[in-house]
Amino acid sequence: LCSRDRLIKGQTAFTKWSDVLTKIELAYGVERNVLLAIWGIETSYGTTRGEISILSALATLAFDGRRRQFFEAELSAAIEILHKSARFSSQFKGSWAGAMGHVQFMPSTYLNHAVDFDGDGIADIWSDSPIDALASAASYLSHHGWIPSLPWGSVVELPRHFDYALTAPNIRKTVSEWVDIGLKALPENGDAMGSLILPMGATGPAFWISDNFDALKRYNNSNSYALSVGLLSNAFTTNEYCHLQWPTNIKALSKTDMKTLQTQLTEQGFDTKGSDGIFGPNTELAIRAFQKRNAMIEDGFPSLGLLERLRKNQQ
């Protein structure tokens, strides 16, 4: 998501919409680089907004049944939008999941957070102009805890012999406290609170993340998404491609393997609170407890090696 091509196109968009982004930043306190990154990742700066009928997409998903209540509510919200403004009927298109416009709002998000920033009397996130859409994204982040001028996070360098138990999600420290532990490349705000994450375990990059990272996850509840937005936003500042050395020898667990891992952990006394094949906080805590019990690096990462270790324990 954070590619060289997206950076170059974003720089062009930055120049074109610079004055608007400045005004939005002043109004909502959300940095222009972050808004530009969201726009770039969601729709490649408005070039891929989706061509599927929103009503058809939501009706299909509601009928499918896996998240019926959620999509029925979104379908109701979509109908409400059209009831309020029939002018959107010809533009009412988006993704297969029902997300709409330059910044891919769901209908309920539009009703709650869309704003008319250009002053034409209507919050239009579908038009060729991204002004209302970018302001609406800023409005959303502002309402979900975005703190002005606080860095979302940074790539950090861990000291030798680092205690990976400190990367548990419930451990938060100030920047100054992390520096005292030996971390490098942290933001300059010594009082800022944050925690550490290891998206690929102990062998991959480490990140310090702040409350603004959590605000980005309210937009899309995925560490990968929030990291992509954050890294791309940084790239607009440095004008450098956001390239990191990710491990190439680590294969992500399939959903079936994840279910097996969760089942094995629970059977061995480390309750994951269910085996749904989705890696979440309960599974991470169970993994960390297993790793601690077995004198392993406590990075909470669901690797194939961990799954094999669990299987051997059952033999």
Feature names for model-found ranges:
Residues 3-41, 51-52, 56, 60-73, ...:
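Export/targeting segments at the very N-terminus of extracytoplasmic proteins
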